[in-house]
Amino acid sequence: MEYKALIVGLGNPGSEYAKTRHNIGFMAVDALAEVAKSRKSMRFKEMGISGDFELFSLNLAGNNVLATKPLTYMNLSGKAVAAICGKYSIAVSDVYVIHDELDLPCGRMKFKKGGGNNGHRGLESIQEKMGSPNFFRIRVGIGRPEFSSQVKDYVLEEFNTQELAIAAQMSQAAIKGLNLHFRRGQGTATQFMNSFMPDLPETEP
């Protein structure tokens, strides 16, 4: 079977990271997996490479696509992406990466192709292994802590209850945006994702 694209959700493996800000990409791919035609785990060693990833086959807007969660740590994510793209002949321009973005507030997202990595180790790894920055990025905002020295701990902290509800909405918005992209093109998808605003859950008094 030929696949039109690879959707990559970035995160860290392990239950202790499941609800952390750095794992919004995993959350989005888990949401995608709920509509997947099939789900299977594949090991890099089957391709002669050490490491693991989860791989999903699904249909978006009539297109066969793959989605993956690299089960290495964030800074090695590119190994999974390069291995899958090599096996299934997917070009870097057909890779879509969903990741956390410090420079956007929680509840906002941006869709773009190429550009800088803003210090994101997962994006840097993908660019290094694929040899190009020209992949799509769905940047999901998590906000930024007050001081730069707090970033490392901040991204590994769990979302609070309100943020977790917003993250679920952002995951669904990313899925809708990808469907729009494959159905109507990049412009329509960009307009939707860049203007998306979540319904803020009510907080207890």
UniProtKB/Swiss-Prot annotation:
It is an enzyme of class 3 (hydrolase). Hydrolyzes ribosome-free peptidyl-tRNAs (with 1 or more amino acids incorporated), which drop off the ribosome during protein synthesis, or as a result of ribosome stalling. Catalyzes the release of premature peptidyl moieties from peptidyl-tRNA molecules trapped in stalled 50S ribosomal subunits, and thus maintains levels of free tRNAs and 50S ribosomes. The record marks 12 as: Discriminates between blocked and unblocked aminoacyl-tRNA. Its EC number is 3.1.1.29. PROSITE patterns: PEPT_TRNA_HYDROL_1 (PS01195). Signal peptide: none annotated. The active site is at 22 (proton acceptor). It is found in: Cytoplasm. Belongs to the PTH family. It holds the Pfam family Pept_tRNA_hydro. TRNA binds at residues 17, 73, 75. One of its GO terms (biological process) is rescue of stalled ribosome. One of its GO terms (cellular component) is cytoplasm. Keywords: Cytoplasm, Hydrolase, RNA-binding, tRNA-binding. GO terms for molecular function: peptidyl-tRNA hydrolase activity; tRNA binding. Monomer. The keyword Methyltransferase does not apply. It catalyses: an N-acyl-L-alpha-aminoacyl-tRNA + H2O = an N-acyl-L-amino acid + a tRNA + H(+). The keyword Cell membrane does not apply. Coiled coil: none annotated. Its main location: cytoplasm. InterPro entries: Pept_tRNA_hydro, Pept_tRNA_hydro_CS, Pept_tRNA_hydro_sf. Gene3D superfamilies: Peptidyl-tRNA hydrolase (3.40.50.1470). Transmembrane segments: none annotated. SUPFAM superfamilies: Peptidyl-tRNA hydrolase-like. This is Peptidyl-tRNA hydrolase.
